[in-house]
UniProtKB/Swiss-Prot annotation:
GO molecular function: structural constituent of ribosome
InterPro entries: Ribosomal_bS21, Ribosomal_bS21_CS, Ribosomal_bS21_sf
Gene: rpsU
GO annotation terms (biological process): translation
Pfam families: Ribosomal_S21
A GO CC term attached to the entry: ribosome
Ribonucleoprotein among keywords: yes
Assigned protein family: Belongs to the bacterial ribosomal protein bS21 family.
Full protein name: Small ribosomal subunit protein bS21
Organism: Psychrobacter arcticus (strain DSM 17307 / VKM B-2377 / 273-4)
UniProt keyword terms in alphabetical order: Ribonucleoprotein, Ribosomal protein
């Protein structure tokens, strides 16, 4: 968990903002949302496979766009 030390004469709202930024960088919120409900191992595999397919299709699309430009 990220920790933020409040500096001397630093307003609390700025320290809170730094803490929020540190949490966002560490991925705390996304991890909490991901673990909010139990996900079956088959669903995890299915979700990861779908994400991999999506990444692959996106990569192919980017490569075809690069090769078709002839100007």
């Amino acid at each position: 968990m990220p920790a933020v030390k409040v500096k001397e004469n630093e307003p609390v709202d700025i320290a809170i903002r730094r803490f929020k930024r540190a949490c966002e960088k560490a991925g705390v919120l996304s991890d909490v949302r991901k673990r909010e409900f139990y996900e079956k191992p088959t669903q995890v595999r299915k979700r990861k496979k779908a994400a991999a397919v999506k990444r692959y299709k996106k990569k192919l699309q980017r490569e075809t766009i690069r090769t078709t430009r002839m100007y």
